[in-house]
From Swiss-Prot:
GO terms for molecular function: 4 iron, 4 sulfur cluster binding; electron transfer activity; glyceraldehyde-3-phosphate dehydrogenase (ferredoxin) activity; metal ion binding. It catalyses: D-glyceraldehyde 3-phosphate + 2 oxidized [2Fe-2S]-[ferredoxin] + H2O = (2R)-3-phosphoglycerate + 2 reduced [2Fe-2S]-[ferredoxin] + 3 H(+). Sensitive to oxygen. Activity increased by 58%-93% in the presence of acetyl phosphate, 3-phosphoglycerate or 2,3-bisphosphoglycerate at 10 mM concentration. Inhibited by up to 25% in the presence of crotonaldehyde or formaldehyde at 10 mM concentration. Inhibited by up to 50% by sodium dithionate. 3.5-fold increase in activity observed by addition of potassium phosphate or sodium arsenate at 200 mM concentration. Activity enhanced by potassium chloride, sodium citrate or sodium sulfate at 200 mM concentration. It is an enzyme of class 1 (oxidoreductase). PANTHER family: ALDEHYDE FERREDOXIN OXIDOREDUCTASE, TUNGSTEN-CONTAINING GLYCERALDEHYDE-3-PHOSPHATE:FERREDOXIN OXIDOREDUCTASE. Keywords: 4Fe-4S, Iron, Iron-sulfur, Metal-binding, Oxidoreductase, Tungsten, Zinc. InterPro entries: Ald_Fedxn_OxRdtase_dom2 (IPR013984), Ald_Fedxn_OxRdtase_N (IPR013983), Ald_Fedxn_OxRdtase_N_sf (IPR036503), GAPOR (IPR053617), OxRdtase_Ald_Fedxn_C (IPR001203), Tungsten_al_ferr_oxy-like_C (IPR036021), W-dependent_AOR (IPR051919). This is Glyceraldehyde-3-phosphate:ferredoxin oxidoreductase. The keyword Transmembrane helix does not apply. Catalyzes the oxidation of glyceraldehyde-3-phosphate to 3-phosphoglycerate. Uses ferredoxin as electron acceptor. In vitro can also use benzyl viologen, but not NADP or NAD, as electron acceptor. Probably acts as a glycolytic enzyme in place of glyceraldehyde-3-phosphate dehydrogenase (GAPDH) and phosphoglycerate kinase (PGK) in an unusual Emden-Meyerhof glycolysis. Its EC number is 1.2.7.6. SUPFAM superfamilies: Aldehyde ferredoxin oxidoreductase, C-terminal domains, Aldehyde ferredoxin oxidoreductase, N-terminal domain. It comes from Pyrococcus furiosus (strain ATCC 43587 / DSM 3638 / JCM 8422 / Vc1). GO terms for biological process: regulation of glycolytic process.
Length: 653
């Protein structure tokens, strides 16, 4: 297929526009894999300017089909070690007016720089706007009563809005977390009439894209937009409602509106549960399997987990329903979409993963307390999942006396036991959430030596802390044993998504996203788990490759092959192509020195072992009781062996 590419060298201030045509490239991830291999980025550190950041839209942006306008970022992750896609909802809707498919960022700017991409309808212009580092730090600390990514967004709006007069545009920014940690995200808020739209916030966060953007390239923001333009599809014009509808209805044999509504009910509104969105749907579904207190579920008796879940429903879920669902405070990510999945209240966008990681996982089950922690974590520009997992780990370490509050930059010891949550849910939550907010500022700004070490990630930090504080550890104990992450190679790591799901802990070429089987509460035979992981990963690859929102996967999966044929006249063996590209991701990882390893955290091993018992697999539960470590190794090896066979490569212990 044909794509247009803009190559920017931010160090030399050089711009090159290109058209590429390749039979095996159908989207951003395909293109990114090709370019990173051509540039051999596996040879260099993730913060080397050679580690290009590629971002762009998929081949169906510009269509009328909802969900097709995610902006995809592709880079080598400083956390996990390999190539990584991270996607941002809705931002492709404004980016399509720039008039290119993909942008490559090369080189390193001398000073913190904003890239400005504008298409006035006649030509595309690229400008660079510099900010002194001291000024940037000042803005992050406070601008017009806000901080971090919110402050920088407003500052750039005030200074750059006139550049885009009469045009639709959007700004993507990083926060201080990108400067001082491996877990910096890229934030963007939809704009309406030049003002930030409440609740319409989105992130490209997983894997640390913000950190790469700033630390490899010294880019702090990208402003993009232009005059409205129509995308030309070489085949059928799917920017025409009637044409797109015909394709969807031809596959599903029912009205497009019904197809979309039925398959997105969880994300819009579920009348059976009287709630909607990921936050509304997940808490009732997970029950006592909700991750709490740094994943201590294996050590908390079921009846007490049930009590904690009842308190979560009362103090977390019910206020959300009253303040967001009942008054219908729902919006979109910035593209026209009937799902309106962005639920918000009191100026806060409320999504399950950030509010879970920086809420119950970090010792807060009171919604108004978590508003403080989540907003601070977001403002600092963290990947909220990665940071929440890190904060939960730090709070437990401080509670156990392995780290001291002053060392990590917080004011007190947390109340971090099941009894604290059960007997004083509000007070314990308020204290813990306040400490998470303090920790977010401490780590983002690198306020202490230990805070700067923690910013590297749990696994990388543990290697240093094990040596630094060895006198605090008992024989054979490691800081790693309290951390929950999926390991890769010697130092690769990523925080799993917020489900007690065995598939979340398997070291796959892409983890921490949904390229796995993330169903909680089931313990499958290893070969069956591998099969379900592959079935999921092959299609998650495609959603990222074409920049389509996965909330639409229920109807879009069946339509995608037909869309390629109708709009572009190309026939693709979807699953075979995905397998081929996953093999390329694996080859890249091996060249970079990353292969699967056994779990090096006792907490992760306990989650898997206890999972076998809790989720009702008696055979494996018995084996784990007899030999926990040996059984864990056997299980993981069998999963990876079966995965390797299904993908057609070698990816095993």
């Amino acid at each position: 297929m044909k794509f247009s590419v803009l190559k920017l060298d931010v160090g030399k201030r050089e711009v090159e526009a290109q058209e590429i045509e390749r039979e095996d490239i159908f989207g951003v991830v395909d293109y990114g894999i090709m370019r990173h291999n051509e540039l051999r980025t596996y040879e260099v550190d993730p913060y080397d300017p050679r580690n290009i950041v590629i971002f762009g839209i998929g081949p169906f942006a510009g269509s009328v089909l909802p969900g097709s306008h995610r902006l995809v970022f592709f880079f080598r992750s400083p956390l996990y070690g390999g190539l990584f896609p991270s996607t941002m909802g809705g931002a492709g809707y404004q980016f399509k007016n720039v008039g290119v498919d993909f942008v490559e960022i090369h080189g390193k700017a001398e000073k913190p720089t904003v890239i400005i991409l504008k298409n006035d309808g006649e030509k595309l212009s690229v400008d660079f706007y510099e900010i002194e580092l001291e000024k940037l730090l000042d803005v992050w600390k406070e601008y017009k009563g806000e901080e971090g990514v919110y402050a920088l967004t407003q500052y750039l709006l005030d200074n750059l809005a006139s550049v885009f007069e009469g045009m639709e545009f959007r700004i993507a920014v990083v926060g201080p977390a990108a400067l001082n940690t491996n877990m910096g995200a890229i934030f963007s808020q939809a704009l309406r009439n030049g003002k930030r739209a409440v609740g319409s916030e989105d992130w490209a966060a997983r894997g640390g894209p913000g950190s790469v953007l700033l630390r490899a390239h010294n880019v702090v923001a990208i402003a993009f937009g232009g005059k409205k333009r129509k995308r030309e599809f070489p085949g059928e014009d799917i920017s025409d409602v009637k044409v797109a509808k015909r394709v969807v209805e031809g596959i599903h044999k029912k009205a497009q509106r019904d197809v979309i509504n039925e398959s997105t009910v969880k994300y819009r509104y579920n009348p059976k549960l009287n709630t909607g969105g990921t936050f509304g749907g997940n808490y009732p579904a997970e029950g006592d399997l909700v991750p709490v207190l740094n994943w201590q579920m294996p050590y908390i008796p079921k009846e007490e987990r049930i009590k904690i879940h009842e308190l979560i429903m009362k103090y977390y879920w019910e206020p959300f329903n009253k303040e967001s669902i009942q008054p219908k405070n729902w919006t979109t990510c910035g593209e026209p979409c009937p799902v309106v999945c962005k639920k918000h209240r009191k100026g806060h966008h409320v999504e399950y993963e950030p509010y879970e990681a920086n809420g119950p996982l970090s010792g807060s089950i009171y919604l108004y307390a978590s508003d403080i922690s989540v907003h601070a974590v977001d403002a600092m520009g963290f990947d909220a999942i990665e940071f929440g997992g890190t904060a939960a780990w730090v709070l437990e370490l401080v509670h156990k006396g392995l780290l001291k509050p002053a060392e990590v930059g917080i004011s007190d010891v947390p109340e971090f036991t099941k009894d604290d949550l059960i007997t004083k849910p509000v007070e314990a939550s308020e204290k813990n959430a306040k400490l998470v907010a303090e920790l977010a500022h401490s780590i983002a700004f690198g306020k202490t030596e230990v805070a700067r070490i923690i910013g590297m990630g749990k696994r990388k930090a543990s290697k240093i802390l094990d040596e630094k504080f060895k006198d605090r550890l008992s024989y054979g104990e490691s800081f790693k044993d309290y951390g929950v992450y999926t390991p890769l190679g010697d130092d690769g790591e990523i925080n799993p998504t917020m489900y007690w799901a065995i598939g979340n802990f398997i070291p796959l070429p892409i983890q921490g996203r949904y390229w796995t089987f993330y169903q909680f509460g089931v313990f499958l035979e290893p070969e069956e788990l591998a099969q379900k992981i592959v079935s999921s990963a092959l299609w998650e690859f495609w959603y990222d490759n074409v920049g389509w929102c996965r909330f639409h996967r229920g109807w879009m999966k069946k339509v995608l092959k037909a869309l390629f044929m109708e709009a572009y006249g190309v026939s693709i063996d979807m699953e075979e192509h995905a397998k081929k590209q996953i093999r390329k991701l694996i080859d890249y990882l091996k060249k970079a020195g990353y292969e699967p390893v056994f779990w090096d955290s006792m907490r992760v091993i306990d989650l898997v072992a206890k999972g076998s018992e809790e989720f009702g697999n008696e055979n494996w539960a018995k084996k784990f009781k007899e030999d926990k470590i040996g059984t864990a190794k056997e299980y993981l090896k069998r999963v990876l062996d079966a995965y390797s066979q299904l993908i057609g490569t070698e990816w095993t212990l």
